[in-house]
């Protein structure tokens, strides 16, 4: 009797295989932590199938393993394909299959274990911006050949700013440079850079913009992978040249910029030509033109002598006279052409020489002008910038004078 009662109780409380499986599936698939879980491990095996990519992820010591699947529609979205022997971090959810009594991880994303989430976010943003066409070569704009005003966005305390100033002054004296300071490292950097670019656009004078900073660790350059900064560069109304760091990975700002170089100095060299190099190129062209003219003249003289010899052999006075007149006309025409081109070349060279002289700040000072600087070294361009009592440094053609403002008159 007792045995029958015990058997009846067990039978009433016993679960079927499907009942137990359904219960376990509810526990696994409805657990919030298991619906989106990151798992790190080593890929021990892979199997490519028409329906998807199947692989096993295990601990390095082999003490535990889990089967994983990436369905075919999701495979192209993976940042890293599973390869046997490699360490991966995968993102997925737990699924239980009643027929086999097995559970496995349905994977949505996989990244190398040594790179982590930051690389994943970088790749996802890069793919999204690429799909929008922000990196298309057709979007790249040409830089102005001879800009009169450029803007620079960087930190006022960075060595990059000094390198850019030195390069611009050496290559293109007289250039007007607008400086829009920004923080280029840390959490506040993206917003600061976006505001600095906006200031340049609002000012409206710059023809090209340099966005730059010196070298640094990858984490220090994170602001140049920020979506806000990337879109600000992409939407900028003037061409943008980036010069970020010396040895670094490619940043998203580099990809979207119109021109990308590796250093602040190289960025400055990109936006302006070297007047000295231009002058030398023009001299070389004049020399080449002179050589061409000499060659043409020599060739014509040789041809003329050949014709003379032929005419002498023909002994036809009338024909000789006609040919002599024709050759004389050709000679006069050649001389006129040679003199004309030579004069044009001289005028062009003189124009370049005068332009170089006019761009030389010392030449301007020799004509009686002066450069007035405030105590902080900034050039005073308007009486509005000055106040009574300010000390000024006046640079003349010969020497420098220190003065103090005793009265300020506003121009009506």
Curated annotation (Swiss-Prot):
BP GO terms, sorted: DNA catabolic process
InterPro entries for the chain: Exonuc_VII_L (IPR003753), Exonuc_VII_lsu_C (IPR020579), OB-fold_nuc-bd_dom (IPR025824)
UniProt GO MF annotations: exodeoxyribonuclease VII activity; nucleic acid binding
Protein EC: 3.1.11.6
Superkingdom of the organism of origin: Bacteria
Catalyzed reaction equations: Exonucleolytic cleavage in either 5'- to 3'- or 3'- to 5'-direction to yield nucleoside 5'-phosphates
Keyword list, A-Z: Cytoplasm, Exonuclease, Hydrolase, Nuclease
Pfam (any one): tRNA_anti_2
EC category name: hydrolase
Localization: Cytoplasm
Principal location class: cytoplasm
Assigned GO CC terms: cytoplasm; exodeoxyribonuclease VII complex
The family this protein is said to belong to: Belongs to the XseA family.
Role, per record: Bidirectionally degrades single-stranded DNA into large acid-insoluble oligonucleotides, which are then degraded further into small acid-soluble oligonucleotides.
PANTHER family tied to this protein: EXODEOXYRIBONUCLEASE 7 LARGE SUBUNIT (PTHR30008:SF0)
Subunit structure: Heterooligomer composed of large and small subunits.
Record protein name field: Exodeoxyribonuclease 7 large subunit
Organism annotation: Nostoc sp. (strain PCC 7120 / SAG 25.82 / UTEX 2576)
Lineage: Bacteria, Bacillati, Cyanobacteriota, Cyanophyceae, Nostocales
Encoding gene, per UniProt annotation: xseA
